[in-house]
Regions:
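Active-site SXXK
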Residues: 2, 27-53, 82, 140-144
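Active-site-proximal helix/loop microenvironment
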Residues: 114-166
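Solvent-exposed loop/turn segments at secondary-structure junctions
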Residues: 11-14, 59-60, 88-90, 131-132
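Structural recognition of the beta-strand scaffold that forms the well-ordered cores
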Residues: 5-7, 93-94, 125
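Periplasmic/cell-envelope proteins involved in peptidoglycan metabolism and beta-lactam response
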Residues: 1-26, 30-31, 48-51, 109
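Conserved catalytic neighborhood of penicillin-recognizing serine enzymes
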Residues: 47-105, 121, 150, 162-173
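Secondary-structure transition/capping motifs at alpha-helix termini
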Residues: 14-15, 42-51, 115-117, 146-151
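Short, charged, amphipathic alpha-helices and their helix-cap/turn boundaries
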Residues: 100-116
Length: 177
């Protein structure tokens, strides 16, 4: 439904009144891989969990190696393995393939509530060039849990006066991605 049932905005309100769940943006790092690369490729019918992907050493266009911890790559693996171990190189190749095939990655991400300023960043599927709030990123992930249907996040479902009259009622926004 998109309803937020509870959240923690910070550990000590007396020291910091910033609501970190809704207001603080951070790099989502590798947690973008299922949304920005693999989920879209699967939805487009281009890949499945057993699709074999390259995890051989690869460099970005500027010559810097694409790394995973201390490893530059290991060989071939399935998409499921790449996702399970969060390998960077298969995510890079998947995202690159989506762009080369002209898949509307921006459209997918916007339907899940993401505002990404630049889609040409090679490290984007590893979280480079994107910052999100916890609430925004959680809302993107609920789209996966809801079989590709986006439900806009909301905290208040209705406001009711003391006499029982509903003064505000939330209307659910659902969009297929």
């Amino acid at each position: 439904t998109g309803a937020i049932l509870g959240f923690v905005g910070g550990r000590n309100y007396q020291e910091n009144q910033n609501n970190h769940a809704f207001d603080t943006k951070r790099s989502p790092a590798s947690t973008t891989k299922p949304l920005l690369a693999y989920g879209i490729a699967i939805d487009q019918g281009l890949m499945g969990s057993e699709t074999i992907l390259s995890n051989y050493p690869t460099n970005f266009a500027n010559g810097n190696p694409i790394m995973y911890a201390n490893s530059k790559g290991t060989g071939m693996m399935t998409l499921g393995e790449a996702l399970n171990y969060s390998w960077n190189i298969p995510a890079y190749w998947t995202y690159r393939m989506l762009r080369e095939k002209g898949v509307d990655v921006k459209g997918y991400m916007e339907k899940m509530g993401y505002e990404i300023p630049e889609y040409g960043i090679e490290s984007l599927p590893m979280g480079g060039g994107i910052e999100v709030t916890v609430a925004q990123h959680t809302n993107g992930y609920q789209t996966l849990a809801n079989n590709g249907v986006y439900h806009q996040k909301h905290v208040i479902s209705k406001i009711e006066s003391s006499d029982g009259k509903i003064t505000v009622s939330y209307t659910h926004l659902t969009l297929p991605t």
